[in-house]
UniProtKB/Swiss-Prot annotation:
Assembly information from the UniProt record: Homodimer.
Full protein name: Proline--tRNA ligase
Annotated gene: proS
A biological process term (GO) from this entry: prolyl-tRNA aminoacylation
Entry's localization field: Cytoplasm
Lineage: Archaea, Thermoproteota, Thermoprotei, Sulfolobales, Sulfolobaceae
Organism (species): Saccharolobus solfataricus (strain ATCC 35092 / DSM 1617 / JCM 11322 / P2)
Annotated family: Belongs to the class-II aminoacyl-tRNA synthetase family. ProS type 3 subfamily.
SUPFAM superfamilies cross-referenced by the UniProt entry: C-terminal domain of ProRS, Class II aaRS ABD-related, Class II aaRS and biotin synthetases
Gene3D superfamilies (UniProt xref): Anticodon-binding domain, Bira Bifunctional Protein, Domain 2, C-terminal domain of ProRS
Amino acid sequence: MQITREKWSKNFSEWFDWVLREGEFYDYGRYPIKGMGVWMPYGFKLRQNIIGIIRNFLDSTGHEEVLFPLLIPEDLLRRESTHIKGFEEEVFWVTKGGSTDLDVKLALRPTSEVAITTMENLWLKSYKQLPKKYYQIVSVFRYETKATRPMIRLREITTFKEAHTVHETYDDAQKQVEEAIEIYKKIFDTLTIPYVLSERPEWDRFAGALHTYAFDTIMPDGRAMQIGTVHHLGQNFSKALDFKIQKKDGSLDYPHQTSYGISDRAVASVIAIHGDDHGPVLPPSVAPIKVVVIPIPAKNEEETQQVMKYSIEICEMFNKNNITCLTDQDTEKTPGEKFYIWEIKGVPIRLEIGPRELISGTVFIKRRDNFKSYTVRKEEAINKIKELLNEIQEDLRRKAWEDLKSRIEYSNDIEKAKKILGNNSGIVEVPWCGSNECGLKIEELTNARVLGYPIEKREVNDKCVICKMNAKTVLRIAKTY
């Protein structure tokens, strides 16, 4: 079968809406509040699997899960002035309890730095309790005024993993930033999501942070999308909330903090990145169903029932070996209709079992990612499926990285950079002197967004595209979500 990616790349927005709807991942646009969608059972299971991977990586590195209230008092949210300025226009406010006006407005959590720091101030008193690493997976709310998009730009972000850590010194906090970056690399690698890692420029840091490091991927339409961020907060929040600890030398001082987050966009990326015109291709590491069995009816009812029995037996064999399998027993739909349904759900492997397989004691296997097919004996099926699931996982990761790298270009000419971005090409790297003035000018002239600069030192033997002074690094720019 020929694999095409025409709709996937050229009409990505329509493709994504179609996949979420027809694949029964997420119902968006019909719940009567803009920017809020409903996770359907199949999509919710995918979300759970992704959250499970995130939890495993955090739990295994000493993070402890907590759960904070949804509401934050206005006076508390305003304690860190730079922070509230960054979020003020996006906050949802609760102003009434029943018909009674509240004395203090309550914010629906846009993020939790001030709320968590408030409680850390009560819990943590000494360097002996540090480092301390908390995380929670919750809904956050942002009053988005731009066009909302399912899973990508929402007013309720339902899968917000935010980690918050406390350290005695700046250097300890920086080590935690480095650990967080490594954790995120492993998470995205397991999810088969490719990325570029950049430090955001000064004018685009998280409100209240000293440094912001961001993971961006490239979606099928060439737009870059932020999928994770890591922030070195320094002492900004601890000072604002008068949070002090006793240090090793006996003195009292403000601790240093970090925070880092991943959202619904991780799920959106998993669905989108490996797709084709048949739908998504879910990596086996998170697919809710790894193998679907499609019974092919025989010419008579008795043999058809035998085929169904054999199909169920094969599927049970996989489930007993921890390979999530489902037999499609719907007798109202044709095999072709079932192929369409399970392809748009992105199930990695399909088994087709008919009279021929029943008689020969074999199974017919088809991969979702490349539609290659194999016939193996029943007793060989477990090992073959395990082998293919590993191959699919690695092939998806490799091809996604190849695609991302092919969409990153270098240009030392601002007009050429603008033209490349106009063709929805992905990310352009331009030589940059390091000044905010030139960086903002690059954004203005290209009508694009600056993603930042590489965190590793990059030798650039070129001139800044704006001021023509010697470049210190490259600045990454892209059309973004």
